[in-house]
């Protein structure tokens, strides 16, 4: 297996065959921006976003260059989420002032394993660091969403909260009841689309068409790539084949992927 964190390095294009959400938004006049409190070079994330949607990438080094943090400042992955949310408010205000469609994508990190990052806002509610961090970050996210809802641009803005993967701190979840189904968190706020059907079995791949659908895009056949629009009644691949079978298929070598995506 290739070292995925080293993919796209040097002069190599990052997944040249991919056509992403960012590119679709760019073609429709959106200003794309990525805000992260770490170095954009990790796993070449910055390169991916710059090549797929012409994102302006505001990372840890950007924060130093713009004097938002001291040159010797380094906490956790770079700087903590408390600062990230403050910088996001400034960035959103600037993007909205242009009078053009915009997309701000953010990555929070305080809740990453192991045990999370204890910031100045954390309270000792539970006597356990990770629980305190999770509660603190939840409050910060809620406060940030409430701030957006008070802004003039909120009327035409969709907010999507999405976890990138399950928490990898397995020891923290060792006392979970048998049969408890852990999932990544997904919430779509202020979309004109509403889903009133049964609970869904879905994967991160389904967020591609679901995000665009939440923005009002029409999706022929309800699918893009390997993802299914969760606002539709079309089964996801996980629902159609089961998670285990889908997992197995995804791990197989794909000539199409190698030729058309990796190129």
Predicted regions and their residues:
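Solvent-exposed soluble domains appended to multi-pass membrane proteins
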Residues: 1-263
């Amino acid at each position: 297996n290739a070292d995925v964190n080293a993919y796209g390095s040097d002069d190599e294009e990052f997944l040249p065959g991919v056509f992403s959400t960012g590119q679709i938004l760019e073609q429709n006049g959106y200003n794309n921006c990525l805000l992260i409190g770490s170095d954009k070079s990790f796993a070449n994330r910055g390169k991916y976003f710059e090549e797929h949607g012409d994102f302006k990438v505001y990372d840890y080094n950007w924060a130093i260059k713009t004097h938002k943090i001291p040159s010797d400042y380094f906490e956790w992955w770079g700087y903590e989420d408390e600062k990230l949310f403050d910088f996001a408010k400034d960035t959103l205000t600037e993007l909205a002032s242009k009078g053009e469609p915009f997309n701000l994508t953010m990555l929070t990190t305080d809740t990453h394993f192991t045990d999370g990052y204890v910031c100045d806002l954390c309270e000792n509610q539970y006597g356990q660091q990770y629980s305190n961090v999770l509660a603190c970050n939840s409050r910060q996210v809620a406060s940030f969403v409430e701030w957006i809802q008070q802004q003039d641009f909120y009327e035409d803005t969709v907010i999507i909260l999405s976890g990138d993967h399950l928490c990898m701190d397995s020891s923290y979840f060792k006392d979970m009841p048998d049969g408890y189904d852990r999932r990544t968190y997904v919430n779509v706020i202020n979309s004109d689309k509403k889903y009133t059907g049964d609970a869904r079995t879905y994967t991160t791949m389904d967020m591609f068409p679901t995000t665009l659908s939440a923005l009002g895009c029409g999706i022929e056949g309800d699918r893009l790539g390997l993802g299914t629009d969760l606002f539709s009644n079309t089964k996801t691949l996980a629902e159609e084949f089961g998670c285990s079978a889908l997992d197995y298929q995804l791990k197989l070598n794909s000539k199409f992927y190698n030729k058309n995506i990796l190129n």
